[in-house]
Amino acid sequence: MKKLLILLLFAPNFLLATPLTLSEYIAKNPSWNSSDRPSLSYITLRCGVLFEQISELYKNNVEEQETYKIAPTDAINFFRASSDIYKTSCINYECIKVEKKDSREKVKKWALIYKEELMNNINNNGEMIHGDIKSDFSTCKIKVKPILK
């Protein structure tokens, strides 16, 4: 028990910090939609993961079939944009392989984060789109999706 307390006291802040919402990330990276291609790739990847997780949870919900029909298409478009950005940013195949592997790891990470948060929202609030999820969902729909067209 003492070891756990000592570890918690000395744990770096980044281990205890919650992830930034997309809105917060965008505020810290103001050129995300112009010259900052890595940020745009990261943001579109997170939007893709979020919409994929929403789609999975809405899949069997009869009342939410309209959302279910839209979410997978949006997820695919966000993933495609993220992939296209990192592919065009690389100068060789080796770079693309590294970026693809890194992207897969980010997808796994964010899928777990978003799925847990979506389930917590359902259990605690009776709805999926709430709190930080609502913030990210709105950012993806209002700020990110329009620049992909």
PLM region descriptions:
Residues 3-14:
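Sec-dependent N-terminal signal peptides
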Residues 25-30:
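Short, charged/polar, low-complexity loop and linker segments
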Residues 15-19:
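Boundary at the C-terminal end of the N-terminal hydrophobic targeting segment
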Residues 33-93:
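Short N-proximal segments of mature Sec-exported proteins
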Residues 1-3, 137:
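Alpha-helix initiation and N-capping motif
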Residues 75-149:
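Compact alpha-helical subdomains of small soluble proteins
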